[in-house]
Amino acid sequence: MKATELQKFTDEELKQMLDDLKRKLMDLRFQLEMNKLTNTSQIKFVKRDIARIKTILRGRELGVRR
């Protein structure tokens, strides 16, 4: 998801999405270890989404506007 799309969500919604993505990342890592994950690039995309959400939340915390 793009950062501009994520800006529209509230902090609570972003925190919920962050929790869901962390769970998804954990599941993907387990699948990778068990050799059941066929598309390993999914891990990269989930990690990037987590970073985007954390960046937006931190920016709001500091009062940074873009």
From Swiss-Prot:
NCBIfam families to which the protein is assigned, alphabetical: L29
Keyword Amino-acid biosynthesis appears in the UniProt entry: no
PANTHER family, A to Z: 60S RIBOSOMAL PROTEIN L35/50S RIBOSOMAL PROTEIN L29, LARGE RIBOSOMAL SUBUNIT PROTEIN UL29C
Entries under InterPro entries matching the protein: Ribosomal_protein_uL29 (IPR050063), Ribosomal_uL29 (IPR001854), Ribosomal_uL29_CS (IPR018254), Ribosomal_uL29_sf (IPR036049)
N-terminal signal peptide: none
Family matches, as Pfam families: Ribosomal_L29
Keyword set includes Ribonucleoprotein: yes
Annotated keywords: Ribonucleoprotein, Ribosomal protein
Name of the protein this chain belongs to: Large ribosomal subunit protein uL29
GO biological process: translation
Cellular component GO terms, alphabetical: cytosolic large ribosomal subunit
Gene expressing this chain: rpmC
Similarity annotation: Belongs to the universal ribosomal protein uL29 family.
Molecular function as annotated in GO: structural constituent of ribosome
Biological source species: Kosmotoga olearia (strain ATCC BAA-1733 / DSM 21960 / TBF 19.5.1)
Domain of life: Bacteria
